[in-house]
Swiss-Prot record:
Catalysed transformations (reactions): an acyl phosphate + H2O = a carboxylate + phosphate + H(+)
Molecular functions (GO terms): acylphosphatase activity
Residues at the active site: 24, 42
Domain called Acylphosphatase-like: residue spans: 9-95
Classification via PANTHER family: ACYLPHOSPHATASE (PTHR47268:SF4)
Top EC class, one word: hydrolase
The enzyme's E.C. designation: 3.6.1.7
One Pfam assignment: Acylphosphatase
Species assigned in the record: Saccharopolyspora erythraea (strain ATCC 11635 / DSM 40517 / JCM 4748 / NBRC 13426 / NCIMB 8594 / NRRL 2338)
Lineage: Bacteria, Bacillati, Actinomycetota, Actinomycetes, Pseudonocardiales
Family in the record: Belongs to the acylphosphatase family.
Name under which the protein is recorded: Acylphosphatase
Keywords, sorted A to Z: Hydrolase
Alphabetized NCBIfam families for the sequence: PRK14422.1
InterPro entries membership: Acylphosphatase, Acylphosphatase-like_dom, Acylphosphatase-like_dom_sf, Acylphosphatase_CS
Amino acid sequence: MVTDAQQARLTAWVHGRVQGVGFRWWTRARALELGLAGSATNLPGNRVEVVAEGPRESCERLLEALRSPDTPGDVDHVAEQWSEPKGGLTGFVER
């Protein structure tokens, strides 16, 4: 059983050639496989912001996937920020 203390919110900013290559769709698929809720949003400057909430271990696995060589496009750098989950998220959306 996952307690509230084991829940986390990951915000990751993915830099590189990650727009127009299916990166957000790929991220959504990985997040849903891991049981996470959140979003993947295109930002200016060839960045995608990924927000995911759920079990910390699942968020860590998503972060590993974002940094892996298996992503669509070409990831140069992933910056991360961890915080307490805010809740209210359902599903995983592409924006």
